[in-house]
Amino acid sequence: MIMKELIESIAKHLVDKPDEVNVADVETEQRIIYELTVGDGDYGKIIGKGGRNISAIRTIIFAINAKQGGKRARLDVID
């Protein structure tokens, strides 16, 4: 499973409108930026209380990326 699909799968399980979840990736020389967009009202569910959900998702992404030895990864949630 590629990283983009993993992010999308996790996000779809957290939101009320899974059909509106979209992940785009922007690659630069030094990093890959994943841009997650969700439907209206679902932004808070992705962020979670005190940022716990987004922090956990980012930790998983960083850990997998470090193990694979790829470019640095960043996850942005677009509202």
Predicted regions and their residues:
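RNA-contacting regions in translation and RNA-metabolism proteins
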Residues: M1-K45, N53-D79
